[in-house]
A protein has these predicted regions:
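Acidic, Ser/Pro/Thr-rich low-complexity regulatory regions
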Residues: 1-112
Length: 112
């Protein structure tokens, strides 16, 4: 399987992780992705555990921890829209909190 690795400075971690999370949530909100996507993307413990050493906010960590609950809410018949909007609003705050001097340079590496 071909893989893609994205590299950026740790000081931009909050912005990029919040951006990725927001994109996935918007996809779920629009119906392009299922709620189950949360479990298999950013909701995976292996992903969240990697973030423990990064300088990211408690708000962002809380949103990421909620990713694995989205499918369960759907199975319980609970409307996801309010939860998704709350999570997206939190991610908006995370994105806006970036230091204006932080480098947003990103490097992509493709590997077999």
């Amino acid at each position: 399987m071909q893989s893609l690795k994205l590299e950026f400075e740790e000081s931009a971690a909050e912005f990029y992780i919040a951006s990725l999370a927001r994109g996935i949530l918007e996809g779920i909100k629009s119906g392009a992705l299922t709620a189950e996507t949360g479990i298999w993307s950013l909701g995976r413990p292996v992903f969240r555990n990697t973030l423990t050493t990064l300088p990211i906010s408690a708000e962002l960590k809380e949103v990421l921890e909620s990713f694995d609950e989205l499918d369960a809410l759907t199975e319980l018949g609970i409307d996801l829209q309010p939860t998704l909007q709350r999570m997206i609003d939190t991610l908006n705050r995370c994105q806006r909190s970036i230091n204006v001097d932080a480098s947003l340079i990103i490097r992509a590496i493709s590997a077999p």
